[in-house]
Amino acid sequence: MSDKTYLTKGGYNKLKDELDDLKTNVRQQVLEKITEAKSHGDLSENAEYEAAKEEQAQVESRISTLERVLSTATILDEKDIKTDKVYILTTVLLKDLDRDEEVEYTLVSSEEADSENGKISVKSPIGKNLLGKSVGEIVEIKVPKGIMRYEVLNIKVK
């Protein structure tokens, strides 16, 4: 079950840098913590050892995830993205019809999502409902707080 991941060149490089750091620095630091904890004797009641082993499991899991994502990634070039409809890597200007406010989102992969900077995942409720929409269309999105209604005002590539 390998889902294809679409990334910008910058997003790919960021994940690759994280992977390299985990493999070359973080992994070694965790091994040093394990070695240090082992030197304290009895492992059956060694909280420091257990914490280091848990950290090691988390690091190895993240390494595995990043390797999978990067191996299935397709790097998208923004100049090839169309703006006739909402696609991944398009920036969408929306009018919130309930609050009469405008909001702008850029649709990205889950790995590049950053809601504080207006980057939302295409797998999020908003992202899923925006995909394929055109300027002028009304989008109704079910969210935990109810239904949000937006009008698509503009689609562009930043």
Swiss-Prot record:
Keyword Transcription regulation attributed: yes
At the top level, the lineage of the source is: Bacteria
Q: Does the keyword Metal-binding apply?
A: no
What Gene Ontology terms for biological process does this UniProt record contain? Answer: DNA-templated transcription elongation; regulation of DNA-templated transcription elongation
Task: Give GO MF terms, alphabetically.
Answer: DNA binding; RNA polymerase binding
Q: Which UniProt keywords apply?
A: Coiled coil, DNA-binding, Transcription, Transcription regulation
Q: Which residues form a coiled coil?
A: 8-74
The protein's role, per its UniProt record: Necessary for efficient RNA polymerase transcription elongation past template-encoded arresting sites. The arresting sites in DNA have the property of trapping a certain fraction of elongating RNA polymerases that pass through, resulting in locked ternary complexes. Cleavage of the nascent transcript by cleavage factors such as GreA or GreB allows the resumption of elongation from the new 3'terminus. GreA releases sequences of 2 to 3 nucleotides.
List the NCBIfam families.
Answer: greA, PRK00226.1-2, PRK00226.1-4
Similarity annotation: Belongs to the GreA/GreB family.
Q: What is this protein called?
A: Transcription elongation factor GreA
What organism is recorded for this protein? Chloroherpeton thalassium (strain ATCC 35110 / GB-78)
